[in-house]
Amino acid sequence: MPLYMYQIAYTPESWAAQLKNPQNRIEVAARPACEAVGGKLVGGWYCFGDYDLVLIVDVPNNESAAAIMMAVAAGGAMKASKTTVLMTGTEGVGAMKKTADVTRTYKPAR
């Protein structure tokens, strides 16, 4: 299954609610969301900076990955999020090799 990285920034209201009732949202919210689409949570970390939470998930496809983020966004607890598709080293090299085929046909606008 493909891997995705979610980066999530909470709203101030969400932080206030979490401070009143501290719990590991990685386990109580993220893991069940992944499992609901037939995937699994590989790992999750709280962080500081532009985002408050980073998750690595293994879900069946783009549709499943989008479903998780749509449901989370609809809940209103996020002020920003970012989803990144992750590739293995082998997949990255495979993509590099395929650029030769694309380069033969692609003509940039100039």
Give, region by region, the residue ranges found by the protein language model.
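A compositional/biophysical signature of low hydrophobicity enriched in polar/charged and small residues
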Residues: M1-R110
